[in-house]
Amino acid sequence: SSTGFSLQAMDSSHVALVALLLRSEGFEHYRCDRNISMGMNLNNMAKMLKCAGNDDIITIKADDGSDTVTFMFESPTQDKISDFEMKLMDIDSEHLGIPEAEYHAIVKMPSSEFARICKDLSSIGDTVVISVTKEGVKFSTKGDIGTANIVCRQNTSVDKPEEATVIEMNEPVSLTFALRYMNSFTKATPLSNTVTISLSNELPVVVEYKIAEMGYVRFYLAPKIEEDEEDTKPQV
């Protein structure tokens, strides 16, 4: 749209959703004459983006009504220009309007610390219980070889704000999530020094990484219900 570029994707089991926003003012040049919605295969898009050099300038172009989108990669010295045209997909589902919710607990912590916790716990178990109380935020798991508990207490007396752990809690929360999804989410760690985790009982967790001066990427994951059988999963 004229205000920015937004992307949504959901996994096949409808348990996880990713929402990306890049605001128009963050681009060097941005023009959108009318709102346009495009269906893209993420694997195919990733293949094309991997053809770009680390310092290339990327231009994305699409015409209204066209069944393709063009990715143009220009080297910094402008001595090499590559054009890749990708076929679009027909996707029935509309862009989801995700309502803003009031969360019982919001945890802001270093993104590298969150990634390390998820990686460490996944060597013990398949799920993580995230509990927020006035004591702090606790990440727990159990598996065949034993159990693990990691507690992060509020820590705002750090010189560097990006290394602080800040917890806002209206009421205690305890929810269980699949670690394989959490580990996928932490691949966004290089985007931001901090991650914000928003939790409410019965609602999907929101794991948000801010993209400096441009927008954010948010991951939504439905909690696991312990009594449920493996094949009956709650949906986002």
From Swiss-Prot:
Q: Which GO terms describe its biological process?
A: leading strand elongation; mismatch repair; regulation of DNA replication; translesion synthesis
**Cellular location(s):** Nucleus
Q: Which UniProt keywords apply?
A: DNA replication, DNA-binding, Nucleus
Please indicate if the UniProt record lists Nucleus as a keyword. Answer: yes
Taxonomy, superkingdom: Eukaryota
Pfam families (UniProt xref): PCNA_C, PCNA_N
Which residues mediate DNA binding here? 31-50
Gene Ontology, cellular component aspect: PCNA complex
Q: Does the keyword Calcium apply?
A: no
Which molecular function GO terms apply here?
DNA binding; DNA polymerase processivity factor activity
Q: What does this protein do?
A: This protein is an auxiliary protein of DNA polymerase delta and is involved in the control of eukaryotic DNA replication by increasing the polymerase's processibility during elongation of the leading strand.
**Family according to the record:** Belongs to the PCNA family.
Specify the protein name.
Answer: Proliferating cell nuclear antigen
Lineage per the UniProt record: Eukaryota, Viridiplantae, Streptophyta, Embryophyta, Tracheophyta
